[in-house]
Each structure stands twice: as structure tokens, then as C-alpha cells.
């Protein structure tokens, strides 16, 4: 049995609480002989700043580079609002993405049947929803130069952000989306704004070319990003895999998140290039929710997104898809029994703590393996 090296970075706020439930799961998998994991722990975000006056140390980055997957909690909180800009908690997350070359962000939006009534949309619109949004993570307007605010000297200022994409950046994110679709329902929807943006024109051309050259078996369609956002709310189950740029992906994934009822349910993955020699890629897995300092330490945090993020690591980095499927089944079964953390409670359900939810999911997984 192969041993997988994991780096656990709990971070700040509820990050430590939800990561404890991943550790619980890993401990059981090791003891049961189902898998073999070696884990390292590190500081990131505000916790790293308190210890070392940086958002992540070089030593922790070295551990990340050497790991098979990084499991990340959450960073930030008002405690660190006054720290230097380059040492702010979020800088640790940005350095991990940059130094590991994580260009593809995978954001699934799944609505469990037991939670269909928690969505702001009607049950028949969201029940059974299963979308994967593939967001380009290292290019586009967030990173393009120049990025300036200029004083024009006449009482006015001018702000400039630059949207830039090269062909190779679009090709590689397109391949990630098409490869995912082949393992799902075989459909990709590409979203951009080709009607008003030159980057949208190039995006459309390159995605189409990659499809026609390498993925003719996958259904491809195109939507403008604004109408795509409308369709996510109007008829979300038309989508399988959505591929889009950094800016639109940021927006569309948050829209999709709210279809499911709670940010506490949503995992994510960030993937790098496949190494030609090893066949592996750098990767990081994290819940979509933040550090939620208002509930930190109260045992109220929902650990499902964190556990589901670990499930994505099993699937996309560790070649343990069958175990990932069982973990998904265990989560669904616990929810079907009416067990809830406070963020997803509803009439007739039982509210339990963070640790109780984690324990219930591991117990359900044990039963599935019995």
C-alpha cells in the first residue's frame, strides 16, 4: 500500500476546528488499514504571523512542495486587520497558489436531497444539482499588469486593472474541464464576454480549438458570462462542467454556492500542471467558507466542506476515487438522518456540534466499509 504525504494547514478561526475532523478521519483510515497517510502540520495566515511575522514561512512552503496534497483550513480575522499588507493572512494562501503553480480551481456545487429545502430556490430547481465550476486561477484581471491608481493632478484619479490571457493558459484550463466532463456527464459550458472583451474572443477561440482537436466526444456550448449567471439561477441543472476565467469564475462559483443552501457544505480543489516524469500534480484542497471568527471556538462550525475537500484530495490527487465515493455517501447518509450543524438546521432536524458531525460521518463511513 502506497503511503501518501499530506500537509495539514488549519489556519485561523474555525479552520482548526474543522481540520480536527479531517485528522479524525485520517487516523481511522490509517488504523483500519484502508489507507496509509503521513501527515505534517504547519502554520498559515494569522497563526503564522503571530508566530513568525509572516503569513507562511519558507519551511512550511518546503513541506507543501514535498507533499502529495495540501489540506487547507481557513485564514483571516479582525485580529490581523492592522498587520503589514505583505504579511496579511490571505498572503499565505496566495503564496501557496503561486509557488505551487495552482492554475485550476475546481468548485463543485452539489445539493444533497436532504438539504434541498435549505436553498433559496425551489426544491425542484435544485434537488439533485451537481455542477463543477472550473475557474482559471493564476491569470486574468487579478494578476494582469499594469495595475495602478494614478493621480491626474486635477482632483481626479484613474484606476487601471489589466485583463490578460495567453493561449497556453486557456488551453490548459480547457483540458482540465474537458477531462473532468469525460468522467461526469460529458458536457462543458464555456463562459466569457466575447461580445465586449478581446480576452473573451480569444477564450472562445481557444476553448473551441482544444475541443475540436482533442475532445470531440465531449459536448461543448458557449454562454456569455452574464447570461450564464442568470441561467445558473433560472435552470442550474442544465450545467455539468462550467469553465471560465478568473474574474467570472470568482463570481459564478459564489452564485452556484448559494444554490446548495450553505457555504459550509462546499469544498474546493486547486490543481497545478501534471509533472511529465511522475504523472502527479501539485494540489491544495480547502473549504469555500472563511475563518468565521464570530463562531470560532463555539463548536458550531460545519465540517462537511472540510471533509468533502479531503474527499476531493482522495479523488484528484491520491487515486482513491472509490473511497471518495464512500465518503460522499457517508455525508449524504448523515444528512438524511436529520443531523445538522446550526448553519443548515431546519424544522424537525437535530442540531449537533462540529465534533459530533465529524464523528457521525466517520461512523457512517465505518458502517459502509463493514
Curated annotation (Swiss-Prot):
Question: Does the record carry Lipid metabolism as a key word?
Answer: no
Residues recorded as binding Mg(2+), renumbered to this chain, are 226, 250, 254
Question: What metabolic or biological pathway is this protein involved in?
Answer: Amino-acid biosynthesis; L-leucine biosynthesis; L-leucine from 3-methyl-2-oxobutanoate: step 3/4
Instruction: Report the leader peptide range.
Output: none
One Gene Ontology biological process: L-leucine biosynthetic process
The residues that hold NAD(+) are 77-90, 290-302
User: Mind telling me which InterPro entries this protein's record contains?
Assistant: IsoCit/isopropylmalate_DH_CS (IPR019818), IsoPropMal-DH-like_dom (IPR024084), Isopropylmalate_DH (IPR004429)
- What reactions does this protein catalyze? (2R,3S)-3-isopropylmalate + NAD(+) = 4-methyl-2-oxopentanoate + CO2 + NADH
How is this protein annotated for GO cellular component? Answer: cytosol
Q: What keywords are annotated for this sequence in UniProt?
A: Amino-acid biosynthesis, Branched-chain amino acid biosynthesis, Cytoplasm, Leucine biosynthesis, Magnesium, Manganese, Metal-binding, NAD, Oxidoreductase
Name the cofactor(s) required for activity, per the record: Mg(2+); Mn(2+)
If you read the UniProt record, what top EC class would you report for this enzyme, in one word? oxidoreductase
Do you know which Pfam families this protein is assigned to? Answer: Iso_dh (PF00180)
The subcellular location is: Cytoplasm
Any one GO MF term held by the record is: 3-isopropylmalate dehydrogenase activity
From what superkingdom does this record's organism come?
Bacteria
Quote the subunit structure annotation: Homodimer.
* Known function: Catalyzes the oxidation of 3-carboxy-2-hydroxy-4-methylpentanoate (3-isopropylmalate) to 3-carboxy-4-methyl-2-oxopentanoate. The product decarboxylates to 4-methyl-2 oxopentanoate.
Q: What is this protein called?
A: 3-isopropylmalate dehydrogenase
Q: What organism is recorded for this protein?
A: Rhodopseudomonas palustris (strain ATCC BAA-98 / CGA009)
Gene name linked to the record:
leuB
Amino acid at each position: 500500500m502506497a503511503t501518501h504525504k499530506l500537509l495539514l494547514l488549519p489556519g485561523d478561526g474555525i479552520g482548526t476546528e474543522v481540520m480536527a475532523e479531517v485528522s479524525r478521519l485520517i487516523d481511522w483510515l490509517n488504523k483500519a488499514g484502508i489507507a496509509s497517510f503521513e501527515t505534517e502540520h504547519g502554520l498559515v495566515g494569522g497563526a503564522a504571523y503571530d508566530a513568525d511575522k509572516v503569513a507562511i514561512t519558507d519551511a512550511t512552503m518546503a513541506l507543501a512542495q514535498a507533499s502529495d496534497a495540501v489540506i487547507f483550513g481557513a485564514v483571516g480575522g479582525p485580529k490581523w486587520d492592522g498587520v503589514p499588507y505583505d504579511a496579511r493572512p490571505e498572503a499565505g494562501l496566495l503564496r501557496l497558489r503561486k509557488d505551487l503553480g495552482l492554475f485550476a480551481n475546481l468548485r463543485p456545487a452539489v445539493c444533497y436531497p436532504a438539504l434541498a429545502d435549505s436553498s433559496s430556490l425551489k426544491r425542484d430547481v435544485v434537488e439533485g444539482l451537481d455542477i463543477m465550476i472550473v475557474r482559471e486561477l493564476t491569470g486574468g484581471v487579478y494578476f494582469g499588469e499594469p495595475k495602478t491608481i494614478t493621480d491626474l493632478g486635477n482632483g481626479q484619479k484613474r484606476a487601471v486593472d489589466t485583463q490578460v490571457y495567453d493561449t497556453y493558459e486557456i488551453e490548459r484550463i480547457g483540458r482540465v474541464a474537458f477531462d473532468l466532463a469525460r468522467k461526469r456527464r460529458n458536457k462543458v459550458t464555456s463562459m466569457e464576454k466575447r461580445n465586449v472583451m478581446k480576452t473573451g474572443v480569444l477564450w472562445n477561440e481557444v476553448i473551441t480549438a482544444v475541443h475540436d482537436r482533442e475532445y470531440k466526444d465531449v459536448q461543448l456550448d458557449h454562454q456569455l458570462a452574464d447570461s450564464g449567471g442568470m441561467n445558473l439561477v433560472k435552470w442550474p441543472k442544465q450545467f455539468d462542467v462550467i469553465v471560465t476565467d478568473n474574474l467570472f469564475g470568482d463570481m459564478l462559483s459564489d452564485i452556484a454556492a448559494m444554490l446548495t443552501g450553505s457555504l459550509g457544505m462546499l469544498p474546493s480543489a486547486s490543481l497545478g500542471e501534471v509533472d511529465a516524469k511522475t504523472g502527479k500534480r501539485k494540489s491544495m484542497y480547502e473549504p469555500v467558507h472563511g475563518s468565521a471568527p464570530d463562531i470560532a471556538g463555539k463548536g458550531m462550525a460545519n465540517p462537511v466542506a472540510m471533509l468533502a475537500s479531503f474527499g476531493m484530495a482522495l479523488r484528484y490527487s491520491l487515486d482513491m476515487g472509490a473511497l471518495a465515493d464512500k465518503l460522499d455517501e457517508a455525508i449524504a447518509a448523515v444528512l438524511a438522518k436529520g443531523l445538522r450543524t446550526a448553519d443548515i438546521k431546519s424544522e424537525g432536524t437535530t442540531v449537533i456540534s462540529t465534533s459530533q458531525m465529524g464523528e457521525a460521518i466517520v461512523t457512517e463511513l465505518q458502517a459502509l466499509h463493514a
